């Protein structure tokens, strides 16, 4: 298990990105959080198997919704954190 901090920019606020990311994370059995940042980015903290996290990032970049346009997605490994589930932070 590992935990990654994922920063996503583009047209990702006000278009259902957090909801879509949460749904995808739950389908992939990832745990963590997703929240909007003041600078227009979305921050995701996700814990799971390495291959599953890679799949999650690939699917975030392509195909969540026609209204979502991911311009950049960066990942950084951070100390492993256990979450009970995956949720949106408001």
Swiss-Prot record:
Entry EC number(s): 3.6.1.7
Active site: 18, 36
Keyword Hydrolase applies: yes
Top-level division of the source organism's lineage: Bacteria
Domain called Acylphosphatase-like: residue spans: 3-90
Record keywords: Hydrolase
Catalytic activity: an acyl phosphate + H2O = a carboxylate + phosphate + H(+)
InterPro entries: Acylphosphatase, Acylphosphatase-like_dom, Acylphosphatase-like_dom_sf, Acylphosphatase_CS
Pfam families (UniProt xref): Acylphosphatase (PF00708)
GO molecular function terms attached to this record: acylphosphatase activity
UniProt KW Nucleotidyltransferase keyword: no
Gene3D superfamilies: 3.30.70.100
PROSITE patterns: ACYLPHOSPHATASE_1 (PS00150), ACYLPHOSPHATASE_3 (PS51160)
Similarity comment: Belongs to the acylphosphatase family.
Protein name: Acylphosphatase
Species name: Levilactobacillus brevis (strain ATCC 367 / BCRC 12310 / CIP 105137 / JCM 1170 / LMG 11437 / NCIMB 947 / NCTC 947) (Lactobacillus brevis)
Top-level taxonomy: Bacteria, Bacillati, Bacillota, Bacilli, Lactobacillales
Name of the gene encoding the protein in the UniProt record: acyP
């Amino acid at each position: 298990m590992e935990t990654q901090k994922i920063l996503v920019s583009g047209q990702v606020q006000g278009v259902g990105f957090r909801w879509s990311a949460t749904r995808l994370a739950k389908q992939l059995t990832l745990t963590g959080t997703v929240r909007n940042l003041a600078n227009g980015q979305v921050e995701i903290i996700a814990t799971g198997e390495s291959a599953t996290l890679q799949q999650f990032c690939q699917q975030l970049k392509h195909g969540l919704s026609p209204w979502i346009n991911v311009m950049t997605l960066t990942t950084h490994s951070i100390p492993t954190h256990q979450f009970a589930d995956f949720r949106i932070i408001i």
